Amino acid sequence: MIIKPRVRGFICVTTHPAGCAASVREQIAYVARRGPIERGPKKVLVIGASTGYGLAARIAAAFGAGAATLGVFFERAPADAKPGTAGWYNSAAFHDEAAARGLQATSVNGDAFSDEIKHKTIDAIRRDLGQVDLVVYSVAAPRRTHPKTGVTHQSTLKPIGHAVRLRGIDTDNEAIKETLLQPATPDEIADTVAVMGGEDWRMWIDALDAAGVLADGAKTTAFTYLGEQVTHDIYWNGSIGEAKKDLDRTVLALRGKLAARGGDARVSVLKAVVTQASSAIPMMPLYLSLLFKVMKARGTHEGCIEQVDGLLRDSLYGAQPHVDAEGRLRADRLELDPAVQARVLELWDQVTDDNLYPLTDFAGYKAEFLRLFGFGIDGVDYDAPVEPNVRIPNLIE
């Protein structure tokens, strides 16, 4: 079938298998150009492995360090004439490329928050890897059903204590708009922490440790975004910020647990990129469009694979990791360059409907958004029929 992009709001409801595969190959090629990751991991578990930063971590570990990988994700398979999700096709392509290079790859498809998927993952580690020496936690989900209580918690993107008016882009109409966000209630804050805080990461590490599948010296990291002044009302000072602070508290306990066996636990702070999650946040399309404009002009723009490949080489396995005062690994240094942030702030209130394209890189933002779903990738013939029914080998469901 011929598949074209169909966008509804902040979601593209179609995906292109060949485009997703080409995107994965582009990321692999980037890692290969940078050469081997010295003293890198050899057996890696990535929780949230099918898109964005999690996929990039799996690619960097496998094709940079030669690691065997086990990926956990929650994706929809193709059915009848309906394509699967982008994460499904990304993972299928990853498996194909790994097999071609003789790299072990296993995947588990299901709810990472559940005890069932944790148990299935542990069984797969025992069977295929024995133990893992790196655990990457890269889960972004709007809701979580707690495995012990059965309660489903919904995350909320709101300020705390007062309403906030945010500038942003109505991406459907390509117009500047303002959104008034009311403050979160205490219950909404608690629910957001339950979904996006550190509890599930801790549950994963506790389960892996109790099962004996964490190697001595194992490391774990959870990915997060902090941002700067422009985004603080929504991120650090908002309901999501409370979840991020919970992540910072959680990592201290995990670090103590792993350090006893020569290991380590860190929160890794990554730069703002286009993801399905960030596209839904009212101010982020405008912020990203300005950030891309400024960083591309300076030659410092990076996407997921550049960020995570650099994180592994420079900090997780580098001799001189970039660590902040709170012990987090920082890969967002170029985004937070004072000159970059000052220029973004300078342009923020100047953007109008009339100058949206010349003043920002909204065109680049839109292109990156479509790339998430396999569209706009160089070398792909989007007028040619493509087979949507792609399977993932070594998949556990």
From Swiss-Prot:
Pathways involved: Lipid metabolism; fatty acid biosynthesis
Amino acids binding NAD(+): 48-53, 74-75, 111-112, 139-140, 244, 273-275
Any GO BP: fatty acid biosynthetic process
UniProt keywords, alphabetically: Fatty acid biosynthesis, Fatty acid metabolism, Lipid biosynthesis, Lipid metabolism, NAD, Oxidoreductase
Record-marked site positions (Plays an important role in discriminating NADH against NADPH): 75
Chain positions recorded as substrate binding sites: 225
GO molecular function: enoyl-[acyl-carrier-protein] reductase (NADH) activity; NAD binding; trans-2-enoyl-CoA reductase (NADH) activity
EC number(s) stated in the UniProt entry for this protein: 1.3.1.9
Database matches in Pfam families: Eno-Rase_FAD_bd, Eno-Rase_NADH_b, Enoyl_reductase
Residue positions of the active site: 235
Catalysed transformations (reactions): a 2,3-saturated acyl-[ACP] + NAD(+) = a (2E)-enoyl-[ACP] + NADH + H(+)
InterPro entries xrefs: Eno_Rdtase_FAD-bd_dom, Enoyl-CoA_Rdtase_cat_dom, FabV-like_NADH_b, Trans-2-enoyl-CoA_reductase
Family that this chain belongs to: Belongs to the TER reductase family.
Quaternary structure, from the entry: Monomer.
Function: Involved in the final reduction of the elongation cycle of fatty acid synthesis (FAS II). Catalyzes the reduction of a carbon-carbon double bond in an enoyl moiety that is covalently linked to an acyl carrier protein (ACP).
HAMAP family xrefs: FabV_reductase (MF_01838)
Protein name: Enoyl-[acyl-carrier-protein] reductase [NADH]
Organism listed in the record: Burkholderia pseudomallei (strain 1106a)
The gene coding this protein: fabV
